[in-house]
Amino acid sequence: MKLNVSFPATGCQKLFEVVDEHKLRIFYEKRMGAEVEADLLGDEWKGYVLRVAGGNDKQGFPMKQGVLTNSRVRLLMSKGHSCYRPRRDGERKRKSVRGCIVDANLSVLALVIVRKGEQEIPGLTDGNVPRRLGPKRASKIRKLFNLSKEDDVRRYVVKALLPAKEGKENAKPRYKAPKIQRLVTPVVLQRRRHRLALKKKRLAKRKSAEADYAKLLAQRKKESKVRRQEEIKRRRSASMRDSKSSNQSAPQK
């Protein structure tokens, strides 16, 4: 079995091939996330504590956290599940994954050093691999360099040195810097003020339209009420005329 060991403190990662099955027994029946003392792997591992991060079996199927078995299962997966990347929106697919319990059928086991031991391991703990990219967000750059709100963040951007082109080795070195996100500049403040002004303008326009509509509605109701009263008055007068004419035309006894 191969052990893919990483050390987050230095950023290094190294692959070890262990032939002796007796040394690997310390990992058997352990779940993903379990911490194991690695003293039995050899003298150079004395004092080291490793965390089981995952692995693949001999057919290449990955271990999945939460599947409490040491065999292979087929699960219906959707967006957000580990070991699966949807190709279309809302797509679900049944995929074969391995359980989160370690056994002898794994080909590669991923481990993370939680506690460093007494000795250095060549290629893993003695070197240091710097991060290729620095932070991109303005607040994270401030946090990294302990800056205040008044400091200019643009001066502290971590730039990457670009390799020189062929035939231009003596030219001025070129750097590549990320575009800072969430950076507050005068243009950003101007856009914010413009958006607020548009919002206030829309609000005033809506209130004016509502007032005009309420005024028109009240006027229409008043006109309708006047027309209804006039109609009632006209009908009443017409009925009174009809009753008078009928009384006059009736024969006297």
UniProtKB/Swiss-Prot annotation:
One of its GO terms (molecular function) is structural constituent of ribosome. Residues 226-244 have a biased composition (Basic and acidic residues). Transmembrane segments: none annotated. It comes from the Eukaryota. GO terms for biological process: translation. One of its GO terms (cellular component) is ribonucleoprotein complex. Gene3D superfamilies: 1.20.5.2650. Residues 209-253 are annotated as: Disordered. Ribosomal protein S6 is the major substrate of protein kinases in eukaryote ribosomes. SMART domains: Ribosomal_S6e (SM01405). It holds the Pfam family Ribosomal_S6e. Keywords: Phosphoprotein, Ribonucleoprotein, Ribosomal protein. Belongs to the eukaryotic ribosomal protein eS6 family. Component of the 40S small ribosomal subunit. Plays an important role in controlling cell growth and proliferation through the selective translation of particular classes of mRNA. This is Small ribosomal subunit protein eS6.
